Amino acid sequence: MSFSRRPKVTKSDIVDQISLNIRNNNLKLEKKYIRLVIDAFFEELKGNLCSNNVIEFRSFGTFEVRKRKGRLNARNPQTGEYVKVLDHHVAYFRPGKDLKERVWGIKG
């Protein structure tokens, strides 16, 4: 697989894949409920990050908020103008061991 033109997976694609997985296990759950669960999951993730909590999913990875230092000499790439960037917080994801190993094995 070439990394220059990768397929994009949307939330709707994930809902479809989960729905198929559930049906393959002889269970029934409508897609609208799967979408509600996914939306609630992301709201919880965002809420916890905004509360500065660390969110850990064993073997998958860890989400956290980190402080990024500001810079005096940042440049706006569109205008070329130099601007001051203040200290700010960013969401950060650190992959877990399982995920790292699986991604490491991707061919292409």
Swiss-Prot record:
<protein>
    <recommendedName>
        <fullName>DNA-binding protein HBbu</fullName>
    </recommendedName>
</protein>
<dbReference type="InterPro" id="IPR010992">
    <property type="entry name" value="IHF-like_DNA-bd_dom_sf"/>
</dbReference>
<dbReference type="GO" id="GO:0005829">
    <property type="term" value="C:cytosol"/>
</dbReference>
<dbReference type="GO" id="GO:0030527">
    <property type="term" value="F:structural constituent of chromatin"/>
</dbReference>
<dbReference type="GO" id="GO:0030261">
    <property type="term" value="P:chromosome condensation"/>
</dbReference>
<dbReference type="InterPro" id="IPR000119">
    <property type="entry name" value="Hist_DNA-bd"/>
</dbReference>
<dbReference type="GO" id="GO:0003677">
    <property type="term" value="F:DNA binding"/>
</dbReference>
<comment type="similarity">
    <text>Belongs to the bacterial histone-like protein family.</text>
</comment>
<keyword id="KW-0226">DNA condensation</keyword>
<dbReference type="InterPro" id="IPR020816">
    <property type="entry name" value="Histone-like_DNA-bd_CS"/>
</dbReference>
<dbReference type="Pfam" id="PF00216">
    <property type="entry name" value="Bac_DNA_binding"/>
</dbReference>
<keyword id="KW-0238">DNA-binding</keyword>
<comment type="function">
    <text>Histone-like DNA-binding protein which is capable of wrapping DNA to stabilize it, and thus to prevent its denaturation under extreme environmental conditions.</text>
</comment>
